Curated annotation (Swiss-Prot):
Belongs to the parvalbumin family. This is Parvalbumin beta. One of its GO terms (molecular function) is calcium ion binding. InterPro entries: EF-hand-dom_pair (IPR011992), EF_Hand_1_Ca_BS (IPR018247), EF_hand_dom (IPR002048), Parvalbumin (IPR008080).
């Protein structure tokens, strides 16, 4: 799904950083996987993969499954991790992350 954007090694490095429950940090994942240095167009494509229901937003249930977009065998995020991820990315307080919010979240480092 991320061909031409992330290599398998980049994805593995990102997943390696958050194997234990409650160890996920979106900033760490974005940095380790190299997502933080991608273009807005590339990040918009990544957003489209994570937005599984194609609503134009990443909702809480999609955040919980975030890691599985990168590896189908990856774990669900815990409720705590999901809530922190949402809080980091949802700058307008509507309870979901839009594409602009996602691009800012990934690139702000």
């Amino acid at each position: 799904a991320f061909a031409g954007i992330l290599s398998d090694a980049d994805i593995a490095a990102g997943l390696q950083s958050c194997q234990a429950a409650d160890s996920f940090s979106c900033k760490t994942f974005f940095a380790k996987s190299g997502l933080h240095s991608k273009s807005k167009d590339q990040l918009t494509k990544v957003f489209g993969v994570i937005d599984r229901d194609k609503s134009g937003y990443i909702e809480e249930d999609e955040l919980k499954k975030f890691l599985q977009n990168f590896d189908g065998k990856a774990r669900d995020l815990t409720d705590k991790e999901t809530a922190e991820f949402l809080k980091e990315g949802d700058t307008d307080g509507d309870g979901k992350i839009g594409v602009e919010e996602f691009v800012v979240l990934v690139t702000k480092g």
